[in-house]
């Protein structure tokens, strides 16, 4: 028994020492490159293969899980796409798990502000909330890589994802891209609050057949237009991550394009993450028909220095290794960028990290960032500045509530907050109708509401009122969440381009205007 006790004590002592082991890659006094080299030496092959996915975790070495978040106009942890995950409801049905966040106007609205300081603050708020949910013990939403900003250019309004872009101008988009990156990543010279992963490189300008088409143009258009926001995002914004688009450029699909290494890494200095879009490996083989097998496609992706797959890849990487299509050194080169991002997020430091953001969400009774007054005021300011006055020839605006006895608010979007596919769940919502009613609280002005023109309801409301406000527009994901489907031709969304630029409610607007020339279109 005595010898057994000694053996047990020695075993426990060994386990204790192992648990407290300090690895060379945790030494913050070493250069970034030496730390990454040291980590690569510690990794087993299966761990390296795992790091080709979107999680930066290495549990054996104490490196915590860290995945991706959507965050084009605020952290998305809910919304139509259920970015917050799903859970079982009381009736046993699977329902979305919504976590409230501060949601700002879509990127196109952010572009309309022309305000780099505001767009930076939008990034700051989103990253603060990402850290809060990551580090709050009750949540632990393990993600600090933000899929934002979208540095694509909205050159054609028929593009189904126009609202995800800051606009069609390369210079403006570049300035706002840089601002948003700086907000997301923070101002600390060593650590990032979150990592900004731009998308979608390059020329993701169409949704229909995006999985198999090639955007063809010369090097001048590359440098001066399509790639310019990404170039500035890397060289000035110091983003070290982006997503490769589904489409090709002058032939090769972007996830295997030589320019990833030759230009973005070797010339621009992106030493971080390059990831595929969701399902891009399968599309590379089955839509682009670039490679005969999945193993050959997977090997080509890794050799192009694309270091993260957003779809099933492990069996194909293993097959590529077995067949000699890929080497462990190829994988090392591809995942170095992932490890650099992990380093800048403080994930490689161990428990004694100097990360200045590590306590966000850990303070007892901490007020959630989305409930703070400064967050509400920021959302209000950004929303106000995103509104563009196109025409006011009669000087109808601004309205004077004290001089109005009756105002008509009309249209299908007057009393509705529509979330897009990449939206989260707002902490609070105020519709246009509610906002107008709140502004007329004194009771001197009657507010009439008509959703549409059924039985002349809208026309009669307009005739009764001194002013009519008509709210029309597009639905940002086609009124139904079905993929590849938009029942209204002028609606667009991811995977579906618009077939028309005619608003579905133009007739309603014309009838209201005929009944009351004092009509405001929103």
Per-range role (PLM):
Residues 18-522:
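Glycoside hydrolase catalytic-domain context in secreted enzymes
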Residues 1-21:
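Bacterial Sec-dependent N-terminal signal peptides
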């Amino acid at each position: 028994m005595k010898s057994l006790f000694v053996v047990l004590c020695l075993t426990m002592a060994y386990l204790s020492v192992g648990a407290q082991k300090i690895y060379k890659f945790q030494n913050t006094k070493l250069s970034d490159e030496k730390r990454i080299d040291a980590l690569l030496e510690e990794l087993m092959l299966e761990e390296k293969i795992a790091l080709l996915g979107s999680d930066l975790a290495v549990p054996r070495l104490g490196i915590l899980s860290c995945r991706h978040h959507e965050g084009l106009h605020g952290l998305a942890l809910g919304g139509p796409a259920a970015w917050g995950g799903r859970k079982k409801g009381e009736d046993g049905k699977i329902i979305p798990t919504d976590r409230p966040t501060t949601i700002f106007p879509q990127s196109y609205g952010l572009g309309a502000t022309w305000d780099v300081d505001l767009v930076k603050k939008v990034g700051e708020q989103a990253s603060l909330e990402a850290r809060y949910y990551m580090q709050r013990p009750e949540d632990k939403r393990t993600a600090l890589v933000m899929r934002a900003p979208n540095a694509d250019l909205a050159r054609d309004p028929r593009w189904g994802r126009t609202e995800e872009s800051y606009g069609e101008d390369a210079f403006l988009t570049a300035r706002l891209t840089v601002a948003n990156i700086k907000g997301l990543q923070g101002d600390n010279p060593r650590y990032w609050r979150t990592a900004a992963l731009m998308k979608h490189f390059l020329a993701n300008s169409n949704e229909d057949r995006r999985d198999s088409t090639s955007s063809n143009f010369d090097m001048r258009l590359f440098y001066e237009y399509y790639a310019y926001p990404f170039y500035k995002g890397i060289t000035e914004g110091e983003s070290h991550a982006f997503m490769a688009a589904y489409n090709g450029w002058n032939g090769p699909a972007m996830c295997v394009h030589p320019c990833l290494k030759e230009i973005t890494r070797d010339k621009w200095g992106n030493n971080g993450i390059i990831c595929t879009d969701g399902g891009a490996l399968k599309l590379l083989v089955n839509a682009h028909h670039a490679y005969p097998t999945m193993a050959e496609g997977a090997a080509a992706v890794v050799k192009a220095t694309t270091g993260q797959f957003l779809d099933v890849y492990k069996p194909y990487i293993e097959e590529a290794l077995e067949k000699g299509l890929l080497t462990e050194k190829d994988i090392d080169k591809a995942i170095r960028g992932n490890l650099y991002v992990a380093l800048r997020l403080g994930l490689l430091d161990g428990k004694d990290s100097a990360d200045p953001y590590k306590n966000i969400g850990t303070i007892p009774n901490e007020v959630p960032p989305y409930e703070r007054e400064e967050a509400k005021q920021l959302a209000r300011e950004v929303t106000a500045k995103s509104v563009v006055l196109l025409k006011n020839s009669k000087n109808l605006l601004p309205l004077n509530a004290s001089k109005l006895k009756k105002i008509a608010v009309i249209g299908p979007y007057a009393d509705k907050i529509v979330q897009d596919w990449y939206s989260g769940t707002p902490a609070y919502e105020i519709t246009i109708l509610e906002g107008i009613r709140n502004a007329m609280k004194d009771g001197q002005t009657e507010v009439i509401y008509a959703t549409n023109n059924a039985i002349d309801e809208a026309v009669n409301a307009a005739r009764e009122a001194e002013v009519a406000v008509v709210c029309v527009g597009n639905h940002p994901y086609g009124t139904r969440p079905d993929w590849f489907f938009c029942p209204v031709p002028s609606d667009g969304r991811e995977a579906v381009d618009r077939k028309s630029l005619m608003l579905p409610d133009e007739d309603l607007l014309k009838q209201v205007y005929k009944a009351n020339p004092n009509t405001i279109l929103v």
